[in-house]
Regions:
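A nucleotide- and high-energy phosphate-metabolite-utilizing enzyme signature
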Residues: 1-667
């Protein structure tokens, strides 16, 4: 316990690389000097090298990841796979080699009756040892042994590999400035000069300044490869100013393959990514080392977050909030990087962003529920049964983009909290409270975990205004109250909003009950003409308040979401279809996302297949452009002329389905 703070640093400790590399060099030199190739512990590819590989990862990451602080080599190799620091096949190769080397070691010691790891040189002893280990002869034993040692040697060569080729200065400072002269204007040169002459840089320790000078030529080399080098460099300078105060980040850039190139590419592609990293430089490590070849599944995200939450104590609310925030931010950044580099399909990106939110929500509810139950116990259900931790009488419902599985990079979460507890009965813990108080505190605690603003930002903005009675209503509603409100008091626009809802997490019974209520409300018999008129009137109000101004429209500006022919028109048509047609076609309530809703309407014969396909294509194109603009930090406006065909397709269907009197679009 006394040595732990010295062995395991609190954050990822890249500064130990130089020491580890030196230690590795000492091991290699000792092998050559002492000619210990026949020593299966100290020789090349031996037991010591496997242990060194494990200890390298423990020293670098063990301060932040408690599960890596074990002493069993084989268990730690498995943990390195769980922590995604080693690939499964790498760990398996090392484990197999370790077990075989230990078998050989035990055979040597049993035959010699002494503590030695030296292979026998006498042919008689060699033959005997081969027989003991189950081999036909010494040659067969050595073939297997050398294969295992070669595997170990390869992994040993890769760990903290000599980066002199990476860390060498590509050019001296004058040569770098010459390269920059060709791409920087006068203002750019002044900003670079101001950076290098800043008081902040002057105050840096000499070691940190030298690291910055090592990073700089590689950074410029990468910057010169992108389309807009000056803009990219101006985005990177604020990040360098932030991270040079903790030179461990500079070491990380020097130590990670391709880290500088990825950082430059992402900064060139998205000012949003650059600004996120400037605001939260702690994300840099995860961002530059995360896998972006494939988008993660929800199961992978959940397992990752579970592992991270195991690093903090159950009572450490601040630590839990920090992990939720940084997990969300780092995973969203990874999706953005994957999106930009691999041009992911829109729906795959939205799925990934939605899964991140779901995993964070599920964890927040789990943490909040466990904390409350430990203090107050569990409430009773409305039917008198006792709720359980695995099946609480509480659920979180997602509305809007979360409900529709259509989250973007900056989306907030529209949430409604529902319960099925006996509001008057007390919980069964040492400090009992009423069921209603329990649910209110649970919802508030979930909100706290998600929305508390700290130096690391917040996990999500949360909007609960869509709950029954809006701001005037209770933060948590019972299933009974929710049903009564939807049946007797809700406006049509609230039923529209119900189209894009789904249960996110909580007790299975409550989630199933919500699904049933949603289905029954959406399939109520309605006058299609009245629905059409209310949808038209609501959409007109939105356009007047949120759409482009008259002058902007005359200037040929098209707002992708709010103007005629935009995303909201398509969403309103889908919602109209559910409200007007699901009474006769109850399967239209199966899904909450627009793409599958339109497909179901075509299947039911409510829309022609060609109309549904046209709306789907327009919807995906327009939403994909909003994602691109969000990453570029640009407004959601485009040239009306360039989007003329798409707008006309949507507007023609709007006229046919909702508003025959709608004015034609300006060509």
């Amino acid at each position: 316990k006394m040595t732990r703070p010295f062995v395991y640093r609190r954050y990822v400790d890249y500064s130990v690389f130089a020491s580890l590399r030196e230690m590795k060099g000492m091991i290699e030199r000792e092998v050559l000097r002492r000619q210990v190739q026949d020593d299966i512990k100290l020789g090349a590819g031996g037991i010591r090298e496997i242990e060194f590989i494990v200890q390298v990862f423990q020293l670098i990451h063990g301060g932040e990841r408690k599960p890596l602080r074990g002493i069993n080599c084989l268990q730690m190799l498995d943990e390195l796979v769980r922590q995604q620091l080693l690939k499964a096949e790498q760990a398996q190769g090392l484990k197999t080699a370790y077990l075989f080397l230990r078998r050989v070691e035990h055979a040597i010691q049993a035959m010699n009756d002494q503590q030695t790891q030296q292979l026998p040189s006498d042919p008689t002893w060699q033959a005997r040892m081969a027989q003991v280990l189950g081999f036909a002869d010494w040659s067969a034993l050595m073939t297997t042994l050398n294969a295992h040692r070669a595997c170990v040697r390869q992994e040993f060569a890769e760990v903290v590999a000599d980066r002199r080729a990476v860390t060498r200065e590509l050019d001296d400072q004058e040569a770098v400035e010459t390269k920059l002269d060709g791409v920087l204007d006068e203002q750019g040169r002044q900003q670079v000069s101001a950076f290098w002459s800043s008081r902040q840089l002057e105050k840096l320790p000499e070691e940190a300044r030298q690291r910055l000078k090592q990073v700089w030529p590689h950074l410029i080399d990468a910057v010169l490869q992108v389309q807009e080098p000056q803009i990219t460099l101006m985005r990177l300078l604020p990040l360098l100013e932030k991270v040079m105060r903790r030179s461990v980040y500079l070491v990380m850039l020097l130590e990670n393959h391709g880290a500088i190139l990825r950082l430059v590419q992402m900064s060139a592609a998205s000012p949003w990514i650059s600004e996120e990293l400037v605001r939260y430089p702690v994300l840099l490590d995860e961002f530059l080392t995360s896998e972006i070849d494939e988008l993660p599944s929800k199961e992978e995200l959940a397992a990752n977050l579970r592992q991270q939450l195991l690093r903090v104590d159950r009572e450490d609310l601040e630590g839990q909030m920090r992990i939720l925030r940084l997990f969300k931010k780092s995973e969203v950044l990874a999706v953005a990087a994957s999106d930009l580099l691999a041009e992911r399909p829109l729906m795959k990106v939205s799925d990934a962003l939605t899964w991140i939110a779901e995993v964070v929500l599920e964890s927040a509810l789990h943490l909040a529920l466990n904390a409350l139950v430990a203090r107050h116990g569990l409430p009773k259900r409305a039917n008198g049964e006792q709720a359980t931790l695995d099946a609480p009488a509480f659920a979180v419902v997602g509305y809007g983009k979360l409900g529709g599985i259509e989250l973007g990079y900056g989306s907030d979460l529209d949430l409604v909290f529902l319960h099925d507890v006996d509001e008057q009965a007390d919980t069964d813990g040492e400090k009992p409270i009423s069921g209603m108080t329990f649910c209110a505190r649970l919802a508030q605690k979930v909100m706290t975990l998600l929305t508390t603003q700290t130096l690391d930002g917040r996990a999500y903005e949360v909007d609960t205004r869509l709950r029954p009675n809006g701001h005037a209503g209770m933060l948590v509603a019972s299933l009974t109250a929710f049903r009564q409100y939807q049946e007797k008091s809700a406006w049509l626009w609230e039923h529209q909003a119900l189209v894009r809802t789904r249960g996110i997490c909580g007790g299975p019974r409550v989630l199933a009950a919500f699904d049933q209520i949603r289905h029954e409300i959406l399939t109520l018999p309605r006058d299609a003409a009245l629905v059409r008129e209310e949808v038209r009137a609501m959409r007109q109000k939105m356009r007047e308040h949120l759409g482009s101004s008259v002058s902007a429209q005359k200037a040929g500006i098209f707002h992708l979401k709010q103007d005629a022919g935009g995303i909201v028109d398509i969403e309103f048509m889908a919602q109209y279809g559910v409200l007007a047609w699901s009474g006769a076609n109850p399967d239209l309530t199966r899904f909450s996302d627009n793409v599958r809703l339109l497909d179901d309407m075509a299947t039911a014969g409510c829309l022609s297949r060609s109309d549904a396909a046209a709306l789907t294509d327009a919807y995906l194109r327009e939403r994909a452009e909003t994602h691109r603009l969000a990453l570029a930090q640009k407004p959601l406006t485009v040239s009306a002329a360039e989007w003329c065909a798409t707008r006309k397709t949507v507007h023609d269907l709007w006229q046919r389905l909702i508003d025959p009197a709608a004015a034609p679009l300006d060509e």
